[in-house]
């Protein structure tokens, strides 16, 4: 076919993006502004106790009705399907609050029902909170399945600041994985195996720059945490633009999946992919290898991983 033929595909990006302090209390206002008056609310374990008061006061103030509320402990597709099709009529949006499990559960629920999904991550451990895929189990096996990118993402930096250090370092590792992932993607394209999307690639690189070139390298600092949140958000959107996880996931993710299967005590996803990304960059003779080493040293990532090795 002619190289000049345009291939058009619909790309969805979040309409509602809020990153800042005290945002949990404002979710009611954001939903009201978008006319989402009835919601299904899914909590991660322990999250309702921690954040329920703040969130529900804001919902009450703006007349937002919780038509269904549940705490999620499973990511089995059978459970998600059952929950999705038992939601009451009148639900205008699905809201997920917590870590990866509940966000994937709520995201896939909204995808099945073609409802807007509002992602409210309580940690910055990876870019899944804004990706167009869900990590679920089907028949006991872990699967990454297509779903829809969130309609909205609300990140409360007060909540992120209270996270254990391991979550922040996991987020750093998931971001640094872009270096080896983008190299792999370009290599596959050069060998004729893949299509390449320059804009998605540029967006993924820019998300790295935003995090590591502009700000402090201390994961405990509020500026770093804001940048980490924004960078992971961009990474999720880059995957949506590319129509593939390639801008964010390469050989380092395959090593992490192998560790999940083989290691006696697998670590958090981002800690594994960050460590693997450095090894992959060396194998690739990636020109960014020195930068990866400097960042993982300066942020304290290497020291953190070394204190409790794989």
Positions of PLM-derived features:
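Solvent-exposed alpha-helices and their adjacent loops that cap or buttress functional pockets
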Residues: 9-10, 34, 86-89, 110, ...
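Short beta-strand/turn micro-motifs composed of small residues
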Residues: 42-43, 98, 155
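Short glycine/serine/threonine-rich phosphate/pyrophosphate-binding segments
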Residues: 49-51, 99-107, 126-129, 248, ...
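A short, small-residue-rich loop immediately preceding and capping a beta-strand
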Residues: 87-109, 113-123
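A glycine/threonine-rich phosphate-anchoring loop and its flanking beta-alpha core
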Residues: 112-207
